[in-house]
Amino acid sequence: MNTIYIIPIEPIDQRYTKQWYDNIPVVLEQQIAERNLDYHVVTIDGEDFKPDVRTEGAFLDFGATNVYKSTQTTAVSKLFSNGKVKAGDKFLITDAWNFIITPIKYMSDLLDIPVEIHSIWHAGAYDPSDILGYKMQPDWPNHVEKSWYHSSDYNYYATNFHKDMFLRNLNIPQGSYNKAIRSGQPHELIVDNLTQYQTTPKTNTVMWPHRYNDDKQPAIAEDLSNDFRMVITQKM
């Protein structure tokens, strides 16, 4: 039996990442059972480090996220070193901006253990409107992103717009476009949970559910709130 290792982004209660942490293993198990496949699903957690000072407004704490990712990397390295990772195993990286991709590919190649790397891209320095895009110094992050793209066997994007922007801004050669897949995102169970509210009486309200940070342009939402009822969830 082969293993699908899930390398999750931090499960944050206020964000969809907690729902992904809970739901992706369930969805995978369902699909494995329906297709009568022979896979075991394992989630590799990182250390839930709580720093004294946190990054304001950002999706992740820019210090603590490296503790989380590095402890994930340590765990995976031990699995490779102890012979637990087998040829044909798969790694699902639920946020591709994770340096763990490099050691997984390194160990797979040098230990002669061919595995597949599946990476979900959310944002990065390749997007000039993202916080990484306007805060990181050129040009190192783009070289890193290209490396992780090519290290991954499959790269997933929620929309064609996102996929095309990634390929264009990083100048990915057309011969490597086959690694880029417009997949949508695994929100099935979230949608299922919301169907119970379909018949609930509704009012004309706009919900703005994003992080209250410059890269999300909250000033636009604040300005529009003068014209109609706007609920900014981070200010509730």
Pin down the residues of each PLM region:
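Donor nucleotide-sugar binding/catalytic pocket of nucleotide-sugar-dependent glycosyltransferases
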Residues: 150-201
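Short, well-ordered alpha-helix to beta-strand connector turns
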Residues: 87-89, 114, 151-154, 203, ...
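N-terminal pre-catalytic "stem/leader" segment of glycosyltransferase-like enzymes
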Residues: 1-103
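Short, solvent-exposed loop/turn segments at secondary-structure junctions
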Residues: 9-14, 45-50, 96-100, 123-126, ...
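Membrane-proximal helix-turn-helix segments that form the acceptor-binding/catalytic region
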Residues: 134-155
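Conserved donor-binding/catalytic core segment of Leloir-type glycosyltransferases
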Residues: 183, 188-233
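Active-site proximal beta-strand in glycosyltransferases
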Residues: 90-96, 109-131
